[in-house]
Curated annotation (Swiss-Prot):
Biological classification of the source: Eukaryota, Fungi, Dikarya, Ascomycota, Saccharomycotina
Cytoplasmic face residues: 1-11, 56-79, 149-213, 263-268, 332-338
The keyword Transmembrane helix belongs to this UniProt entry's keyword annotation: yes
Topology of this chain in the membrane: Multi-pass membrane protein
GO MF terms held by the record: fluoride transmembrane transporter activity
Mutant lacking the gene: phenotype: Highly sensible to fluoride, but not to other halide salts. The growth of a double deletion of both FEX1 and FEX2 is inhibited at almost a 1000-fold lower fluoride concentration than in the wild-type. Has increased intracellular fluoride concentrations.
Record's function text: Fluoride channel required for the rapid expulsion of cytoplasmic fluoride.
InterPro entries: FluC (IPR003691)
Keywords: Cell membrane, Glycoprotein, Membrane, Transmembrane, Transmembrane helix
UniProt-listed Pfam families: CRCB
Residue intervals passing through the bilayer: 12-32, 35-55, 80-100, 128-148, 214-234, 242-262, 269-289, 311-331, 339-359
Protein name (record): Fluoride export protein 2
An annotated GO cellular component: cell periphery
Amino acid sequence: MIFNPVISNHKLSHYIHVFCTFTTFCILGTETRQAITALSTYTPAFVTAPTVLWSNCSSCMLMGIMQSLNAYTWMKDHQVLFLGVTTGYCGALSSFSSMLLEMFEHSTNLTNGNIANHTKLPNRAYGIMEFLSVLLVHLMVSMGSLIFGRQLGKEVIVAYGSSSFSKPYTPPSDTVKENAGDVDTQEMEKNILEFKFKTPAPFFKKFFDVVDKLAYALAFPLIILFVVLCAYYENYSRGKWTLPCLFGIFAGFLRYWLAEMFNKTNKKFPLGTFLANVFATLLIGIFTMVQRGKKHFSTDIPIVNSLNSCHIVSALISGFCGTLSTISTFINEGYKLSFINMLIYYTVSIGISYCLLVITLGSYAWTRGLTNPIC
């Protein structure tokens, strides 16, 4: 085999481009989710806080827009940017494991507010209603946001932002693969055959170029910034604003690797996303148990009873677990499956994840008890 330095350098630069862009969007997605959660936590709120409902809604809408832009070949020259926005930013902005934790806490009456105020459900059967309330609201809002985003991208952005028709194209071999769960090559090919491929207006091309270059350039400065802030500030920001973004980088790449490795094994069941969501839910149950579980049955002191340790666990919950799992890709994959396969995929994912929370967090809560964390 003849070594070609030109090809090798091209692949290396492509991988560096993917790494930097994906890292930037993972950091921004995690930080955005933290900000939206903090912004939506107020009294009296129509949507009970804290919740990731707003984050899931926003990420699914953006995912829908990007799907339409890519289907009409707007992103053909910016496939790395497309990967960063969909799998990176939208994946980090939304959270499957946090949704499952909300579902478990509300259905078992174990939210922080219920424990602090000694609030009880009329009877335990109302836990079923709470379970369905969280499940249906999250899924319906997320699916509705995805569909709205796709129509917004198709009927508004593509329809009014295209300058002309362009020639069909063949994606390069080093572009983003469809195994990540966020690329629909079948829809793209269908639009090409129907001569629906369009060229974005110069403004959008320039905008994509600027965002792509910024994401490429900001990766290492952002990493250095958050490392310095995390080391310097020892207050609540470590568990809420700085550490979660650093943990989110590793979680985002793990989720992408799982999707690349396992989604192609079964087209009717995206195994990679399933493994990422289930594993993240298992971890969030364990971390929540450590943070909120009573150290002794007779006291309200949690297992993690130092402030710094509590901040680290909080960062693992919101940063690593929140970014490792995703609703935007989960909903987008279900949208592209047949209705029966979608039901199977959603039911198995949610059912197994909820059972893992019952086994880990539930068993400890019902034997030793939960309390509010110290941070």
